[in-house]
A protein has these predicted regions:
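A short, Trp-centered hydrophobic/proline-enriched beta-strand micro-motif
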Residues: 6-13, 108-110, 140-145
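Short, structured patches in soluble enzyme cores that scaffold and shape functional sites
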Residues: 45, 114-116, 145-149, 156-158, ...
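Sequence termini and other peripheral, non-core segments
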Residues: 1, 6, 14-18
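Secondary-structure boundary elements
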Residues: 92, 100-106, 135-137, 146-150, ...
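Non-catalytic accessory segments adjacent to catalytic cores
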Residues: 11-120, 124-125, 166
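Short, surface-exposed beta-edge/turn micro-motifs
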Residues: 5-8, 36-40, 139-141, 151
Length: 185
């Protein structure tokens, strides 16, 4: 699907033994700002930007059992290089800044994450990264999302947005979630 430049998402739910794929049939950019249509939503942090949807109604979907071929995944994804002290120092400063903001009452929760931008990466390399994320983060929601008009994103998050247990729903705030204050966004 990537070679044909058609939108798709591949994801695994936390602790799941299978992963899912949703393959859009065309390259149309579907926007669904009112969340009225079923599919996989990719929403930006900026609420002024459009919510992109890979719609169920215009996609093929598959579930793949991880024991059927991806059970032997390399676990040596972590680099054995010496950590870059400059990046480590920047990270420590960022943690300290977050702690001070919490103590001042400006923030109640801070989540630091790593970001890497890769340009010109081959599809085989990206699938290798995805399979390593599956192995290294078994309790996380792991995904690769692609749209030729938006780009490719991959990630792993341990946070649960919504958990359904019978008729009981539990939720928690995710990174970036802030308390609503009248007149402030």
């Amino acid at each position: 699907h990537y070679e044909a430049q058609l939108p798709f998402v591949i994801y695994r739910k936390p602790k799941a033994e299978s992963f899912f794929s949703l393959l859009q049939k065309d390259d149309k950019l579907h926007v669904n700002n009112d969340l009225s249509e079923a599919g996989f939503v990719f929403a930006p942090f900026d609420s002024n930007q459009n919510i992109v949807l890979i719609p169920d109604s215009n996609s093929l979907s598959f579930e793949i059992d991880l024991s059927q071929g991806l059970n032997v995944i390399p676990t040596d994804f972590a680099s054995d290089k010496t950590p870059d002290l400059h990046n480590r120092a920047d990270h420590i400063k960022l943690v300290e800044k977050g702690i001070h903001a919490i103590k001042r009452g400006d923030l109640h929760k801070v989540v630091l994450s790593r970001k890497e931008s890769l340009e010109g990466i081959a599809w085989d390399s990206f699938m290798d990264i995805f399979t390593r994320m599956l192995s290294n983060y078994p309790t996380a929601f792991v995904y690769v999302w692609f749209h030729p008009k938006v780009g490719m994103w991959a990630g792993a998050t341990p946070e649960t947005l919504l958990h359904l247990d019978g008729n009981k729903i539990q939720t928690m705030s995710l990174a970036g979630t802030q308390l609503y204050k009248e007149g402030k966004i």
